[in-house]
């Protein structure tokens, strides 16, 4: 074990990669974070500082998580206030895990027919027609009202200071410049982001003070609503909910809808007024003495639980970390779990029958049946969804669709022959060690917070990232999450677009408990790779004995065989990302097994996590060793 630190520790971002040899005992590129009293970790240094400031004010982990959420939504390259927030909260008073569903819904008029009439196969990736109703403001306000201690005024103070002006990071400033063609399509976005119109570089310079007066005015309205309610004798909770009402039913809603519709959006005042945050029961499974909690099937989170159920009977330690057999086992169970995700997951609201078969999907017997079909000699490029209904005593209402389900979407085109293909040992044609997709870093962040009272919060907020379409004079970037719907039942019967429905999303915070007490809190960005990376992080800790920082930095694999949740929803059977330092013999063996290999310098996903050291009564923090992920502990 590493020595405990008695002074506050800070995790600093750096760009480095780790080899695959001897990782269980490897030195890390960043030190582990240690704390006795509290911990705040997220994807941005300024946002982590906002969490630390909130703890110093006397806030609990929920207050700190909300402050970090407000700060990250003010920084735009990961998300905006118009996006969506998903959270798991451990309440030490009840010893229960709580799920927060603050995902927006498709607005009135958003139907398959609407998009087909515009020659679209899916809702668009960007712009006002990509937007569901804003969820993050409601999620933050409900979490704070129900489980926090501080006022909204205190919690929003760091974000409001940032909206007044903060030195913009190079990552966002350069992303604005790259995306300025899109940004110029929307007048409010153009006015906000392109601070040097007509210049060779129209985006802000790195380090330039970036000001958001419209957003500051919106946040001020929320605080004013709270303070007026308090002055009128309302309770703390009711005063915060007065701010909620002002956002979703008051003048903020009016300007949001006006700005959306002016630019071609579909939102109505009724859409915002009817939308509500849901406080839900999470789903869970057990894995060798650990209880692992995820959000319900409106996220992809249960796919990680299905994978754990399939892996539990296997001797992963004997296979060896990132051995050929271990990689193959991971890839195959992920094939199966994500095939089920693509077919069976969707909004479980009673208004959208039939109900998703979550009981069968999470059945251990179903997992054993699925794993029994794994071919240990080759990748199964035709892995399809199973039928979980018999494992919950039911009949599959979509049996006919299941029988016709294609293995890949869209059906793959024959690859052109290449004289070099034999020499590449299964490498994806044209792929190189620096071929990292920009989308890997595009949107979403993760937030982890914990305190000495026992509150633990894990959040995966997203939506409204750059290039964001700003809704009028609110300063709020609208979500892009509607693209995760499909328009036809043949592509996913539970996730077909309907007004008022939530899309099935990739966002997936995670809590693991041991003996009823928090053991790990973890989350990551990365779209369809999120649960792949969290699965491997969890196994790194519980199977291979890595510390939380070692597990965060350790190279993972990523599969692209599942259907993408974005854009054209493409799947690439057999495509696997391996770390560039994966041994040549492992690459050769995997190539012979039918894998299409792409080498990458970064494969672990920017994971942030907290480990609870019960032996010493302390917390260990782990934070990604590339990007801007950052933490503070005390």
Positions of predicted regions on the chain:
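Bacterial N-terminal signal peptides
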Residues: 9-22
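Noncatalytic scaffold domains of N-terminal-nucleophile
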Residues: 25-49, 53, 57-242, 247-299
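Active-site rim segments in enzyme catalytic domains, especially the processed small/beta chain
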Residues: 74-99, 116, 258, 263-268, ...
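Short Gly/Pro-enriched turn/cap motifs at secondary-structure boundaries
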Residues: 78, 129-130, 207, 282, ...
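A short acidic/small-residue loop/turn micro-motif
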Residues: 105, 464-466, 526-527
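Internal maturation/activation junctions in enzymes
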Residues: 253, 257, 316-462, 473, ...
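Extended C-terminal subregions enriched in glycine
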Residues: 338, 453, 500-503, 534-535, ...
